[in-house]
Amino acid sequence: IERILSDIKGRMMEDIVLLETKIANPKKQVFQLQFAVGEFDMVVADNANATCEIYEVKHSKEQAKEQFRHLIDEEKLKNTEFRYGKITKRTVIYRGENATLENGIEYRNVEDYLKSLL
């Protein structure tokens, strides 16, 4: 039951982040991007500047390498840049502290992220 609840909370958090980001960025495309294996939970594409930002949304409070595995997958990055322009940001939105890793991946606290949209 705990795993199911965690799954539901994770999906709800994804939906809230996606919806609020869409509302805050009416001139940009905001969507999930599916691949044969895996997905980016959110892409914010700026067609006017041919750039995009890619995100993973996690319900966890902890940082873990598997959370950003898609954000460092060269094939996914190449395909995304081909379709939506240069990737300017790779971020994991989660419930822990803000941090930037050595590989450039950013961790953003979900509450801070949502407040920044206002």
Regions flagged by a language model, labelled:
Residues 1-118:
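A cross-kingdom feature that marks ATP-driven nucleic-acid transaction machinery
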